[in-house]
């Protein structure tokens, strides 16, 4: 066969083999494009796990009509223009091949409008030569990308897709990672017409712990130690779970970001593992959410087809910097910025600048680790023993770890380069309905809140009851039923059996499935909020309530169930309160605008302030 130039569609399909692994890969590429466009809100609609439809809609800057055809062409991008740009990448995308690759294995439609244009335009590519057609459309400022029938023309690739649930779980995980990277962006995820995730933008200076708790869970939030570690152009922020309380479930939380880009980096994982090795068992893994900021000239992100890995020009420096940052927090036992219990919190301590790991000129000189005397000994916190001084040398570790570490550090010596000016990112506004910031827990079940300088008290059990009612109230589709491992069989009277039969359709909408015979009823499934309840008590009470009713409305039954559920928490913690309020704000936004009686009470501090001033 003679050498020949491949047709554009075939070339794009070959490239898609690296870029488009599964529906989650498409979602990642398209959402990253939205973030690069300055979007502050991204709506993601998925159908059948992404095999049928992936729709990404944003409010970014949009694409000009004249550039729509180029947007679907290979190696066409607005992110870089020269080799110098490639050596200091600050955007998430830069290769200009994602849209072309995706359009070659799906039916892709791109609709966009810029603020300068009066109308929107729609583009799609088709045919062997991937000719682009552009036509007028209706669309607000921003961009919408629709990907239909993924892998429809490559049956072999489609055959390797997993079940709908598995593919959507991969998409969900990608969105979780992106939501942790950009707290300033609102992200909504829907599957088969149902909203699954709603991550509201966190205002500047707001509580990032709300989104952290929603994604990583309350258990991680309660054990999280905050990190703020800096030297020169290296900055490490985020949270690491206390290794003394790490569980197998927590160990699955390992999120790392380099200059805002999600990564799976062996060097970073090794540094964190080494810092925690004295407190972790041989089969345990650390849990962390960490953000590393580094001079873009000192990291190469163009080393992996899906951009999951990076290469640091000074691996030893980065490794030691992260190691020292995590180790210092574990030694000091710094607590998360939000107090997670009702005890008085010690005064905040100044976080020192790392001078042991960094050397003098950490980018221009080779990273040679010299013994350095400890320059700082952390002051003991109130009520705790003094923290150990900085270590002069790294502790020993296993031979296999050392071999991996040695291989990771075999990188060429860097060349001296001028520092690139830090990019000025446009401020992204984020407005959301909120009860405010949780200050502390009062009397075990009330949260003291602050919003715009106003103080209020919120009853957590009441908020929990409203949340349960929202979770139980069916919308356009019935509430999802959770099958019981051991069905519950109860004896009922004739009157109760008759009431159950009349209420069967209403109960089915609430996710309660049962079968009845002559004198018994067998509960086979209940909705998720009921799974942790004592059904031996709750279900007979529910049957008794139904026997007294003549009309069976799902909303009324959901309200009764919500009022009779036992609270999950006898003693509320800060983390639990933050998680609850985040869920209430997401599912019950009407409560924020018009709080019902018994939920929220304003607290007037003016008399107390006046009394203090009078003194």
Swiss-Prot record:
Domain of life of the native organism: Bacteria
PROSITE patterns: DNA_MISMATCH_REPAIR_1 (PS00058)
Keywords, sorted A to Z: DNA damage, DNA repair
InterPro entries cross-referenced by the UniProt entry: DNA_mismatch_repair_CS, DNA_mismatch_repair_MutL, DNA_mismatch_S5_2-like, HATPase_C_sf, MutL/Mlh/PMS, MutL/Mlh/Pms-like, MutL_C, MutL_C_dimsub
Record keyword Cell membrane present: no
GO cellular component: mismatch repair complex
Disulphide bridges: none
Disordered, as annotated region: 378-397
Gene3D superfamilies from the UniProt entry: 3.30.230.10, Histidine kinase-like ATPase, C-terminal domain, MutL, C-terminal domain, dimerisation subdomain, MutL, C-terminal domain, regulatory subdomain
Biased composition (Low complexity): 378-391
Listed GO MF terms: ATP binding; ATP hydrolysis activity; ATP-dependent DNA damage sensor activity; mismatched DNA binding
Region forming the signal peptide: none
GO biological process, one term: mismatch repair
Role summary: This protein is involved in the repair of mismatches in DNA. It is required for dam-dependent methyl-directed DNA mismatch repair. May act as a 'molecular matchmaker', a protein that promotes the formation of a stable complex between two or more DNA-binding proteins in an ATP-dependent manner without itself being part of a final effector complex.
Assigned protein family: Belongs to the DNA mismatch repair MutL/HexB family.
Name of protein: DNA mismatch repair protein MutL
